[in-house]
From Swiss-Prot:
The lineage of its organism: Bacteria, Bacillati, Bacillota, Clostridia, Eubacteriales. It catalyses: Endohydrolysis of (1->4)-beta-D-xylosidic linkages in xylans. Pathway: Glycan degradation; xylan degradation. GO terms for biological process: cellulose catabolic process; xylan catabolic process. D-xylobiose binds at residues 279, 336, 363. Belongs to the glycosyl hydrolase 11 (cellulase G) family. The keyword Metal-binding applies. Endoxylanase that degrades arabinoxylan and glucuronoxylan to xylobiose and xylotriose (in vitro). It comes from Thermoclostridium stercorarium (Clostridium stercorarium). Residues 250-370, 387-507, 527-647 form the CBM6 domain. Its main location: secreted. Ca(2+) 2 binds at residues 530, 532, 552, 642. Residues 33-227 form the GH11 domain. This is Endo-1,4-beta-xylanase A. Optimum temperature is 75 degrees Celsius. Thermostable.
Length: 651
């Protein structure tokens, strides 16, 4: 009997230990527990358990914390956060920051995220920090952003006739999804909202922001042991009651008004992480106090977006004051597509309050007045065409997503450029004439930049063909010949596609050089000329690349491409040329004088070298050439060129 009792006691001990281990592995629910769909407030936070069917348990703990379990569900959401009245934008609420920590154990499809809704427009949004077996949302990303030290991919999806806070509806979903999972940290929610709006993903009036665990046809449990939501840091400032004097000829941000009669007007996000005003209706007025017009202004420009044709009256001192002029605004295509429109106004001098009177819906980013003499005379206000002009130092631009950003090594550049965008640089002084332009650019795809005088539809001076540099962070100089102009002009760069631009500079016309009179800056024909040191080139895909053993070469060449090398000094004469090349296919290189269609001096016949990494020297006879000449290499097919050199007559 004693042995049997001992065995039974041992078995009981083992069972108890097993039960303790099992209990230790399952979250202990000790707070207020709910099992089915319910909303309310708890610990100063709004909570909700929502499911379509299945087994769910949610424990409401102190503050924003909670734990949850789910199994055999279709879709279930557990969340604690803050709800609003759908009467304020995120800018008006101020910065929204979530600090969180979660023991997250999904089995199948699930998300750990910040979740919420906006109204007008109706948007369901997710900032996904971690996930289960499937990374949402299974769509093509619109781009990437970096927030809180992490990289997120951005998505936009459409839900048609699906459940929403307003019943069954069709609405947009916005997603930020981390490229690597995490289950604790800080989420700067407002920064995500700003980046979404930069991409044209318009936010409405805030309904909710909550830390959320969502499950979909899965099971699992989670313990949110930290969830602190801070709202209200750095809100949009209220209109100033004691305005200082403002310069009419500097940009005035539309949201920096002093008073309005509107009950619907709101401060909204604009591209480039800016702000503006929107939700404007017929009869709304906005007043800006103490605008200093100095000796006079006769023009007005505003950056606006609208889907309907409308107009804005510009009045002095009151909504019924002197009508200075009317700005007629045509549809820009969408509420997120901003364009600058201008109008003449009656001359106004001194200091006045300015009132904008609206006839219908429009979003306004900013506005500015122009002086009575809108085109300054050449002089101290001009820019030297032959000194580097930073791309970000434009006087005006077109393109809602265009941005100025910092470069890793210092300085700034412009990017987020799309087809049809443009930047204008006023009062560029070309003095006695120019010959070419060089721009420092980076792009992952081939594109082009038109150089125009007098506006985006002005005289076309030339086109810069930009090959892929392989990365948005890999910058190269590209050059193009331009039609000659003299004096002072406004220059506009018109873009045909995505490209980052650091700076550009023009090259003056060399009025002193002649074909037989070498001048400073000439290059000896009898020393190696590096192929990448061309003065201009033709061919959208041509690239400069690094060689394994050091140095550079040109490649990605196609039939009809060419490179030009200026001021090559042949002295008393040269009769042959040698080039160091690599190619997988036989091809030819014509050596021409002056231009791609100039006098043919000779042709280099290039046999296959076995690969594009195997370089050999090939030679050809050319017509005797003396003096200083511009030399053009014209290619008939793919080849990489390291350098070339000419040989003197008789050698």
């Amino acid at each position: 009997m004693k042995r049997k009792v001992k065995k039974m006691a041992a078995m009981a001990t083992s069972i108890i230990m097993a039960i303790m281990i099992i209990l230790h592995s399952i979250p202990v629910l000790a707070g207020r527990i709910i099992y089915d769909n319910e909303t309310g407030t708890h610990g100063g936070y709004d909570y909700e358990l929502w499911k379509d069917y299945g087994n769910t348990i949610m424990e409401l703990n102190d503050g924003g914390t909670f734990s949850c379990q789910w199994s055999n569900i279709g879709n279930a959401l557990f969340r604690k956060g803050r709800k609003f009245n759908s009467d304020k934008t995120y800018q008006e609420l101020g910065d929204i920051v979530v600090e969180y920590g979660c023991d997250y154990n999904p089995n199948g499809n699930s998300y750990l995220c910040v979740y919420g809704w906006t109204r007008n427009p109706l948007v369901e949004y997710y900032i996904v920090e971690s996930w289960g077996s499937w990374r949402p949302p299974g769509a093509t990303p619109k781009g990437t952003i970096t927030v809180d030290g992490g990289t997120y991919e951005i998505y936009e999806t459409t839900r048609v006739n699906q459940p929403s806070i307003d019943g069954t509806a069709t609405f947009q979903q916005y997603w930020s999804v981390r490229t690597s999972k995490r289950t604790s940290g800080t989420i700067s929610v407002t920064e995500h909202f700003k980046q979404w709006e930069r991409m044209g993903m318009r936010m409405g009036k805030m309904y909710e922001v909550a830390l959320t665990v969502e499950g979909y046809q899965s099971s699992g449990y989670a313990n949110v042991y930290k969830n602190e939501i801070r709202i209200g840091a750095n809100p949009t400032p209220a209109p100033s009651q004691s305005p200082i004097r403002r310069d009419a000829f500097s940009i005035i941000e539309a949201e920096e008004y002093n008073s309005t009669n509107s009950s619907t007007l709101q401060v909204i996000g604009t591209p480039n992480n800016g702000r503006g005003i929107g939700y404007i209706e017929n009869g709304n007025t906005v007043t800006y106090s103490n605008i200093d017009f100095g000796s006079g202004a006769t023009g007005f420009s505003a950056t606006v977006a609208t889907e309907v044709n409308t107009s804005i009256q510009i009045r002095s001192d009151s909504p019924t004051g002197t009508l200075l002029g009317t700005l007629y605004v045509s549809s820009t295509g969408s509420w997120n597509t901003y364009q600058t429109v201008s109008t003449n106004i009656s001359k106004i001098t001194g200091v006045h309050d300015i009132v904008l009177v609206f006839s219908g819906p429009v979003n306004v980013d900013n506005f500015i007045f122009s002086r009575s003499s809108p085109v300054p005379a050449p002089g101290d206000n001009t820019r030297d065409a032959y000194s580097i002009i930073q791309a970000e130092d434009y006087d005006s631009s077109y393109g809602p997503n265009l941005q100025i950003f910092s470069l890793p090594g210092g300085g700034s550049a412009i990017g987020y450029i799309e087809n049809g965008y443009s930047t204008t640089y006023n009062n560029v002084n070309f003095a006695n004439g120019l010959s070419s332009i060089t721009a420092r650019v980076a792009t992952q795809i081939s594109t082009s930049i038109q150089v125009r005088a007098g506006g985006a539809t002005g005289t076309l001076l030339g086109t810069i063909y930009v090959p892929s540099t392989n990365s948005w962070d890999s910058y190269q100089n590209v050059t193009a010949n331009l039609s000659n102009i003299t004096g002072v002009h406004d220059i506009t760069l018109v873009f045909s596609g995505p490209v980052n631009v650091d700076y550009f500079v023009f090259t003056p016309a060399n009025v002193n050089s002649g074909p037989t009179s070498p001048v400073g800056g000439t290059r000896s024909a009898f020393s190696n000329i590096q192929a990448e040191d061309y003065d201009s080139s033709y061919g959208p895909n041509l690239q400069i690349f690094s060689l394994p053993g050091g140095g550079s070469a040109i490649g990605y060449i196609e039939n009809g491409y060419s490179t030009t090398y200026k001021n090559i000094d042949f002295g008393d004469g040269a009769t042959s040329v040698t080039a160091r090349v690599a190619t997988q296919n036989a091809t030819t290189i014509q050596v021409r004088l002056g231009s791609p269609s100039g006098t043919l001096l000779g042709t280099i016949y290039v046999g296959s070298t076995g690969s594009f990494d195997t370089y050999r020297d090939v030679s050809a006879t050319i017509s005797n050439t003396a003096g200083v000449k511009d030399i053009v290499l014209v290619f008939s097919g793919p080849v990489n060129v390291d350098w070339f050199v000419f040989s003197k007559s008789g050698t």
